[in-house]
Amino acid sequence: MPYVKVGKENAADIELYYEDHGSGDDTVVLIHGYPLSGASWEKQLSALLAAGHRVITYDRRGFGKSSQPSTGYNYDTFAEDLRHLVTKLKLQSFSLVGFSMGGGEVARYIGKYSSKNVAKAVIISGVPPYLLKTADNPEGVDGTVFQGIQKAVTAERYAFFADFFKNFYNTDQYLGKRISEQALQASFNVAAGSSAVASLACVPAWHEDFRKDVAAINIPTLVIHGSADRILPIDASGRRTAKLIQGAQLSVVEGGPHAIIWTHADEVNAQLTEFLGKGAVRQAGSHHSD
């Protein structure tokens, strides 16, 4: 199995598990959400491969098959981890697609390293621009909400995950229709296998301030968000992010929950393949507008 070394903790290497599928110069890097792994992109992987892309997925530190260190659960480190991956794979031009927490990596990577090698960016149900309510960010969420989540994860993270996924997929509306009991259980199993340290330490990272990072995005960008997202309401995240990025396209999935990459995969995949282009037909970085 392929791994990339991103650091060390004591005598042990910190390694990220990744998968690299397809071929060609039109490369897409998919960055997963909390508390899942790169495998959560399965419905997008097949669609993007069919459209002629090379597709790379990886597991964030602490999740999936990657190492589970006790440190590094902040967006500067997450961006550095991503940098290690694209450097190892010698990617000269690639598009970044982030879901949920992964939207933060898209923003911070470009904010930290510029968009020099990034052709396009896609943020799906993302955490940017800034979730915490402050004097200069009145649209944010009260800090006590995040404190409550941390308490719930600390007290009994498995019970927290089970409850979290109800609003992740809006199961009261879509269970048995757009998501099966088996798929829901599979998500729980992945979450349960995550690092206990990571599942707690990532919560305060959700309210990282990405406003400067988002403002630095100067490449074609697509923001996709569900209108019924209960985890990251669209008005607090997706709509604001799209407004802060010059020329960004906003695509609203009507009735879509947080995890539209699963429940509304056909709609998301159509948007993705249209925006990213089909294989080498379109030059990397060329702008498409509806």
Language-model regions, residue ranges each:
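Conserved acidic catalytic loop of the alpha/beta-hydrolase fold
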Residues: 77-94
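Catalytic active-site module of serine/aspartate enzymes centered on a nucleophile-bearing elbow/loop
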Residues: 246-290
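Conserved alpha/beta-hydrolase "acid-adjacent" motif
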Residues: 230-236
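Flexible "cap/lid" loop of the alpha/beta hydrolase fold
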Residues: 107-112, 116-155
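Alpha/beta-hydrolase fold catalytic core
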Residues: 1-29, 50-53, 91-92, 273, ...
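Conserved HGGG/HGGXW glycine-rich cap/lid loop of the alpha/beta-hydrolase fold
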Residues: 9-71, 85
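Conserved alpha/beta-hydrolase catalytic His-Asp/Glu region
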Residues: 132-141, 152-215
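Short beta-strand/loop motif that positions the catalytic acidic residue
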Residues: 217, 223-225, 229
